[in-house]
Amino acid sequence: MEKKRKREQRKLSRRALLAKKNGVNLFEAKNYQKQKRKVARLYEKIMNQRTDFLNKLSTDIIKNHDTICIENLNTKGMLRNRKLAKSISDVSWSSFVTKLQYKADWYGREIIKIDKWFPSSQICSKCGHKDGKKPLNIRDWTCPICHTHHDRDINASKNILTEGLRIQSLAWRQ
């Protein structure tokens, strides 16, 4: 869908240049106006697909789990990274978290937010050894203590779950 949007956007730009070259006002250029409506419909369709996906995913997660542990990410700061900005805004993380939160309230589920500074990808989920900071290009690593091989994302998700359950048990004790 993204390729189609780009192609239609290029057509719109070409139609604008052609109208400008012929000295026609863009409000009077019929082909430009038709293409503009077509591009707007594509943007709306993409937005509806993303919203539908987020609604279905959040509903599925909430219905199948009593406790959800998520990392409290700084999405505004992450959007400043030009290489990540498009993929982060496409995923719409903050919208997903909002949907999870209101559906959790609706269904009586609990969402535990883990601090963004928690070193989830640095800790071995097997033995608890903190291996230190790693650059983002390192996708998997082996713990020097227990020699367990970890995928960075799966290990981080296990650590986030463990930390969330620890926070939950501390809250129950009080």
Where in the sequence are the language-model features?
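Positively charged, helix-rich recognition surfaces that bind polyanionic ligands
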Residues: 1-174
